[in-house]
Amino acid sequence: MEFRNNFQELKSQIEYLSSLNKEDVTHIIKSSIYELESLKVFNEEELNEINKVTLISEPFNNLFFKYNKERLITKGVVYIEEENDLQFIISLFYFFKQRVPILFHTNSKLQLQSVDILFKFLEENGVSKKILMGINV
C-alpha cells in the first residue's frame, strides 16, 4: 500500500513539474546561480560551467529525439549523489530545468547550501518544494 501511495505522489509531482512555465524554471535557476556566485567559492571557469545549464536546449532539439520522442520514456525520477560539488550543482539545476523530480543525497556543506538556495527560490516563486527530496543514506 505504501508503494502505491508513493507512486501516486510521484506521478502527481511529475504532472506538476510538467505544468511549470519554462521562463519560471529558468528564472529560479538563474536566481539560484546568482546567489551561489555571491558565496565566492567557485572560480570563473566553474561558474561558467554552472551558467551553461540555462543555455542548454530543451531535450528534444536533437533531430533524432525530435522525431522519435513519442516512443521514448521522458518522465521519471533522478537520484543525485555526487562527491564533486560542481557536478552536483550542475546536475541539480539541469534536472530541475528538465522538470524531473529529484532525490538527492548531499555530501558536503556546499551541496546542502546549494539545495537550500534552490528551495528558497522555489518558495519565493510559489513552486512546491516536494519536487526535491533529500535522502539520508
Residues covered by each model-derived region:
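N-terminal Rossmann-like NAD(P)+-binding subdomain of aldehyde/semialdehyde dehydrogenases
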Residues: M1-G76, Y94-V100, N107-S108, L112
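Conserved AMP-binding/adenylate-forming
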Residues: G76-I89
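PLP-dependent aminotransferase-like
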Residues: F88-N136
